Every structure is written in structure tokens, then in C-alpha cells.
Amino acid sequence: SMKESTKADWDIIVARYQPFAKELPDRILAHLRLLGGDSGGFAVDRLQHSLLTATLAHKSGEDEEYVVCALLHDIGDTLGSWNHPDVSAAILKPFVSEANHWMVEKHGIFQGYFFFQHVGMDRNMREQFRGHPHFERTARFCEIYDNPAFDPQMECAPLEFFEPMLRKVFSFPRNSIYKNTCEM
């Protein structure tokens, strides 16, 4: 058990953990590919939507971290069908700024501005966050990147284009209690 473990035990565990941790970008890319083929009723599948969102952000000159957040903003769809923004944000949290994390975490509510009224919800639900330092950033993300990225006629970069950016962002955690214990 962990209670009876020793430093020697943890040296072994950490040594075995490091290669696993370094493979995180590979697992993220594999999971992102799972979004392909499922459109959920939209004109594009979830992978194409993610690629379109990231392409729009990249073409607009957003930094690599922001582009990776755009790419992964819906990666939670497969395992978090009822709370995908929370799942996506949890994956990103150790590696991105607080502003980008908040944007991904809240994007579902902000995106609702465009459709909640059609499903019996309050389209102004995002107003509860009015005045938050990241309100405008998140509203902008949904308005100019997430919302338009359902157009099947729009050109998007392939996943391989974003891979170096993703690997860079996920190269080392900056917001984790473990960041100083396991050098990746």
C-alpha cells in the first residue's frame, strides 16, 4: 500500500512513470482521432470541428497554447457527454494558463448563447460570468472560432499540422502538484 511504501519504492514508481508521462501527447492524439466519424447531427464530425476551430485560431494569429486549446476544446465529448467542457479543461489544466483553462472550461455555457433558446435553456446563461476577467476572451473564442467551425465547406489544416504545437504545450506541466516531483 502507499501507506507502507518507501522512498526506494517511489524511486521505482517514478522511474516507470516518466516514460508513461512522456507519451501523453500520443494518447491525446489517439483520443482526438476518436472524435472522427461522429457528427452528432452537425454538418461536420467532431474531429473536423476541432480541426476547423484550431485552424481558425491559428490563421488569426493566436499563440500555440491557444491554438492547442482550440484543438482540444471538445476532446471531452467522448467520455464527458454531459460535461465535455469540464473534461477537456481537466486535460489541459496542468499545461495551460488560467485564462485558457477558464475559456475551455466555460465554453459550453458561452457557446449556448447561440442555441440554448432552441433547446429550452437560457441563452444568456453566460451572463452569470459578466465581469469575470476572462468573459470577453471566452465570448470571443465562441464567436469567432468555435461557432463558425461547423461549416463543411471550410478548409482546415490536418491533425498532423497541429501535432508539434500539441507536443510542445504538453511537454511539461506548469500547474500540477506533481510538477517538481517527476521531471518529464
Regions found by a protein language model. Name each.
Residues S1-L71, I75-M184:
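Metal-dependent phosphohydrolase cores
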